[in-house]
Amino acid sequence: MKSFLAKKEIKLSWNNYLINAMSHMALGLFASLIIGLIIKTMAEQLQNLFGEYTLFLFLEELGVLTMGLMGPAIGVAVAFSLKAPKLVLFAAVVSGAAGATLGGPAGSFIAAVISTELGKLISGETKLDIILTPFVTVLSGFVTASFVGPWIQTGLQSIGSLIIWATEQQPLLMGILVATIMGLALTAPISSAALAIMLELEGLAAGAATVGCAAQMVGFAVSSYRENRWSGLISLGIGTSMLQMPNIIKNPYILIPPTVAGIILAPISTLLVGLINNPAGAGMGTSGFVGPIMIFTEMGFTLETLIIIILLLIVAPAIISLILSEWLRKIGKIQFGDMKINQS
């Protein structure tokens, strides 16, 4: 059995599904729901400023269409991550769509994983491969979406609602907790974006999550500037702090500055500023400026919101992280080169 599974490139491990597949799910989300929401928001604001010109209406329609194709995008992304053969990969479009329709993003993910692995099992095993492989893939995807998807979506929504409610009741403690967990998830090989969307984080909880994620990205970008210079500043600051993961394993002390920055700024976000966000922006931090764009969407395109974003997501985490990292360098806990990232 092990040799057969190995031949089919089926790896039954948490790492393969919760890290590898979920990371690719996040790419599918970004290529559909998130980019679609950005396009739609941009088109709406252009209409507010200049009127309902044909181009702006076209962009709004494009954004809505792109958002609606979240399920197929997740299906293909997950199947690709699991090294699916061509027929399985293409059929996973249907599995992802069915999962999204019946169970939301989480349902799409589960349906895509199960249908892809079952499709891989039968792929190339019969002379009717061109019929049986896509049939097994779409059938198993739809069955999974129908019976498992709704339960998973309901469960995750309940957890998300509990987090949102708890953050509103205890903004200090929960703000810190949400910011820390989501920030660490962004830096670790876990998709904070997918997690936020599946939990449907919104309001103060989503705002705290954004602050925590931004603190990791901006914090690492600034505190490692002497090693990585401008290219690292951009890669970490608007790319992903996950690039520091190999260095964190070697020296966990480098994780302290950005994490502490998130802990300090989270209560300011929840108690003083009342920063809010939506599920699409909650787990993104400053990556591609998606977090700030979604904050504008929720809080309005105003000068006050711009100042809040600049201070809470960029300036404050940069200053706090730099002060702490320089202190850790001074006492010998961080050495030059400890935060050098591979950019080749």
Segments the model singles out, each with a brief description of its role:
Residues 1-344:
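Pore-lining transmembrane helices
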